Curated annotation (Swiss-Prot):
<dbReference type="Pfam" id="PF08669">
    <property type="entry name" value="GCV_T_C"/>
</dbReference>
<comment type="similarity">
    <text>Belongs to the GcvT family.</text>
</comment>
<dbReference type="InterPro" id="IPR006223">
    <property type="entry name" value="GCS_T"/>
</dbReference>
<dbReference type="InterPro" id="IPR013977">
    <property type="entry name" value="GCST_C"/>
</dbReference>
<keyword id="KW-0032">Aminotransferase</keyword>
<dbReference type="GO" id="GO:0005960">
    <property type="term" value="C:glycine cleavage complex"/>
</dbReference>
<comment type="function">
    <text>The glycine cleavage system catalyzes the degradation of glycine.</text>
</comment>
<dbReference type="GO" id="GO:0004047">
    <property type="term" value="F:aminomethyltransferase activity"/>
</dbReference>
<dbReference type="InterPro" id="IPR028896">
    <property type="entry name" value="GcvT/YgfZ/DmdA"/>
</dbReference>
<dbReference type="GO" id="GO:0005829">
    <property type="term" value="C:cytosol"/>
</dbReference>
<protein>
    <recommendedName>
        <fullName>Aminomethyltransferase</fullName>
        <ecNumber>2.1.2.10</ecNumber>
    </recommendedName>
</protein>
<dbReference type="GO" id="GO:0008483">
    <property type="term" value="F:transaminase activity"/>
</dbReference>
<dbReference type="InterPro" id="IPR022903">
    <property type="entry name" value="GCS_T_bac"/>
</dbReference>
<keyword id="KW-0808">Transferase</keyword>
<dbReference type="InterPro" id="IPR029043">
    <property type="entry name" value="GcvT/YgfZ_C"/>
</dbReference>
<dbReference type="InterPro" id="IPR027266">
    <property type="entry name" value="TrmE/GcvT_dom1"/>
</dbReference>
<dbReference type="InterPro" id="IPR006222">
    <property type="entry name" value="GCV_T_N"/>
</dbReference>
Length: 361
């Protein structure tokens, strides 16, 4: 299994470790619910060094990105970040990702850990424009410092005014005595905070500094278990569950990152444009349990009569709401907010209601 610069730290802290995307990663430390609530109320630290990073540079960088991504990269100015996806030729999604605009001819793509090789091959094979591509996935470490107290802890470690970095904006500078640290106002938790990218040789010093700075705010390390419950409470999609190579961005409710602007002929645009105007055969929805029960990935969604209407893609017991919540694809006639649906849980038909995420208000 691959390791991150923090793997030994996780083991020393007694984390439950498990393989994820080929990496030995911490799933939980003090427990998923405790870690989840720590992020909601204070500050937690996630090792997300397993994520992939590709540089796209040169005079053809923008033309290449406008072709392979669904969002309008031309709208980005230096210092801004964009959520987007790589559509495939069959109406599905290769991956969802972030695009960081450094300058007009320099972009950083941050992709999902499980898809690094697939995404890299996809980019290389579709680079007919001749953009300069560089896979830096093994040369970057990343910590996500999340929660309402994150800014108070991190501000101690830099002269950069963190309150002047808006959501989906980043800066590069000195942090915890280390140069060239990317400080990004992003996250996968809905609790606020920053994501820090840096060279692996700075990892030890940055980890130590962040935990010392956050001690007075009750900082804790957080594993991938709580990362999943936090993102699900916000209704954020997880690739491999809610998105895959068969789900279209229109079906997944990602029409807002699919821009049909003039001159942007991205991969599979005609099919997605048709879906946008004519509708799809299924839609991704959020739902809350009415009956007691925890929906799980793969459970069948049925109507009152017990007929199949879809499938659960993500589900958990919400640590903040203490009810079962989930997301799944349903036939369009069942997608309206307020519609009652049922989950087939091992032969038991349990009631739920379609809601608009986030589940955590």
């Amino acid at each position: 299994m691959k390791t991150t610069p923090f793997t030994e730290k996780h083991i020393a802290l007694g984390a439950k470790m498990h393989e994820f995307a080929g990496y030995n990663m911490p799933i939980e430390y003090s427990g998923i619910i405790d870690e989840h609530l720590t992020v909601c109320n204070a500050v937690g630290v996630f090792d997300v060094s397993h994520m992939g990073e590709f540089w796209v540079k040169g005079p053809q960088a923008l033309a290449f990105l406008q072709k392979v991504t669904s969002n309008n990269v031309a709208a980005l100015v230096p210092g801004k970040i964009q959520y987007t996806c790589f559509p495939n030729e069959e109406g599905g999604i290769v991956d969802d990702l972030l695009v960081y605009c450094y300058e007009p001819e320099k972009y950083l793509l941050v992709v999902n850990a499980a898809n690094i090789e697939k995404d890299w091959n996809w980019c290389v094979s579709h680079n007919t424009e001749g953009a300069e591509l560089e896979n830096s996935s093994d040369n970057m470490a990343q910590l996500a410092v999340q929660g309402p107290k994150a800014i108070l802890a991190l501000q101690k470690l830099t002269d950069i005014d963190l309150s002047a970095i808006p959501y989906y904006t980043f800066t590069v500078g000195r942090f915890a005595g280390k140069e060239n640290v990317i400080i990004s106002n992003t996250g996968y938790t809905g609790a606020g905070g920053f994501e820090l990218y840096f060279y692996p040789d700075a990892a030890e010093a940055i980890w130590k500094a962040v935990f010392e700075a956050g001690e007075e705010f009750g900082i804790k390390p957080v594993g991938l278990g709580a990362r999943d419950t936090l993102r699900l409470e916000m209704g954020f999609c997880l690739y491999g569950n809610d998105l895959d190579d068969k789900t279209s961005p229109i079906e997944a409710g990602l029409g807002w990152i699919t821009k049909f602007v003039e001159g942007k002929e991205f991969i599979n645009r005609p099919m997605l444009e048709k879906q946008k105007s004519e509708g799809t055969t299924r839609k991704l929805v959020g739902f809350e349990m009415i009956d007691r029960g925890i929906p799980r990935h793969g459970y069948e969604l049925v109507n009152e009569e017990g007929e199949g209407i879809g499938v659960v893609t993500s589900g958990t017991m919400s640590p903040t709401r203490k009810i079962g919540i989930g997301m799944g694809y349903v036939k369009p006639e069942y997608a309206k907010v307020g519609t009652e649906i049922c989950i087939d849980m091992r032969g038991r038909k349990l009631k739920a209601i379609v809601v608009k995420p986030p589940f955590r208000k």
